[in-house]
Curated annotation (Swiss-Prot):
The lineage of its organism: Eukaryota, Fungi, Dikarya, Ascomycota, Pezizomycotina. SUPFAM superfamilies: alpha/beta-Hydrolases. Pathway: Polyketide biosynthesis. Probable thioesterase; part of the gene cluster B that mediates the biosynthesis of botcinic acid and its botcinin derivatives, acetate-derived polyketides that contribute to virulence when combined with the sesquiterpene botrydial. Botcinic acid and its derivatives have been shown to induce chlorosis and necrosis during host plant infection, but also have antifungal activities. Two polyketide synthases, BOA6 and BOA9, are involved in the biosynthesis of botcinins. It holds the Pfam family Thioesterase. Induction: Expression of the botcinic acid clusters genes BOA1-13 and BOA17 is coregulated by BCG1 during both in vitro and in planta growth. One of its GO terms (biological process) is biosynthetic process. It is an enzyme of class 3 (hydrolase). This is Probable thioesterase BOA10. Its EC number is 3.1.-.-. Belongs to the AMT4 thioesterase family. It comes from the Eukaryota. It comes from Botryotinia fuckeliana (strain B05.10).
Amino acid sequence: MENPVLIQKAPRRYKSAIPLFLFHDGGGTVLPYYFLESLNRNVWGVSYPHLNDGGTFEHGIKGMGELYAGYIRGKVSRGKVLLGGWSAGGSIAIQVAKCLENIPELCVAGIILLDTPFPDFPDWRPKNSPPVQFHIPVVPDQTAKSRLAQQQAVNDIIHALSVWELPTWENGRRPPPAVFIRALKVVPTEKVVEVDWFREEYALGWQKYPYNFIVEELRVDGDHFSIFTPSYLPELSTKLREALDLLDSKPETGILLDSKLNSSIVISAL
């Protein structure tokens, strides 16, 4: 499996646009991103590498961030990149941004959090209860071994999020600027699902993260899952292009490490 995979190739007139790397959701796949309209740039999708082999990350989200940062450096050697993801993918994007923080050749120009709930969930299960099983649909011709590995991947990603310690930025640094896209509706179930615990809060609770890095919240019709259905995809694609335009033009001053002088200097983002 190619990873990352080029989901959209930039049209000729957008060849110089900042590339976007979108990270997998809690299911480990990047399939939803294939349904988006053109985002006018190269769009790469990063899948969970153990989706089919049953492997795990020893260091959870932090381990994913380090590996995925390496993936990005393999595709873009220098310049600007944009990061983002739907649901769990947004949290992973923040960790990857932290892992790229001291890479002098690369600048994370911004992050898109696509309906990513703040990972501060209540303790809603007894401590000794077994891990939650997040069931996935049956794929035609899928072997029992493959399905078991895929189910294991889902559970591992969700567990990694539940114990993740969000990265901290020090010495005047902060996360790259982010645009949050929030679905307006709740998932139509009898009980409130986890993704809707902060549904009415700005940026689904991310104001609790003490860096004031979200520069804009955009809103789309639909719920957490339906935004990728045909009825809502045109609006979602439009909002994503709007978010990307905002980040493309956002001047951001940060502290980067000068590789030649081996000292910290304040410069404008490349």
